[in-house]
């Protein structure tokens, strides 16, 4: 019995000392980690998919067969004018390519990065079964990024004569409908509960997949159409439907 007690006491002392040392050590690690974070800049994750150069984009665009009945267009949920913008890109007409994309898409720099192209436009390309499908998403992304950098397209603000529209939420659906309505002459206000617009684009997709700066740049283009954003505004708590109507 005495021997067993001695063993138990030894084990108790061992684990007690271990726990104290572990807690002390962890406190030291956490303190060092906190100090390290204060002194070092935050890590920035690069995109996993690199963009084309101008020469690469034009070369890829020239592979398009410009089909008479483009199946790629049928595979696109918004029926983007894919062969048309690729044709303009193949000739180096970036402004024309961007104007064609804008006819259907309000968020091309985002769609060019996160859309499941293999299941949609690119997956319907006649060259896809042979493993040589046109990289439609990367081409769309290239044109959109080129436009952002070079400021090729700056649309005229249409006169807001068709009334007011409230959009609840500034996720991809809210941004898209706001852009479409603004182009048609409606005065659009987006009510967003978060401190920054974007919804799932801003808060739900990791930086290496969709950089926050890209989302912000696309939102700036929507805002440039005359769309107003009301942030930190929770509809249903801070405002109800009657309050919105009371604002006109």
Q: What residue spans do the PLM features occupy?
A:
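Short, composition-biased linear "edge" segments at structural boundaries
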Residues: 17-19, 207
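Beta1-alpha1 glycine-rich phosphate/pyrophosphate-binding loop at the start
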Residues: 27-50, 79-91, 100-102, 129, ...
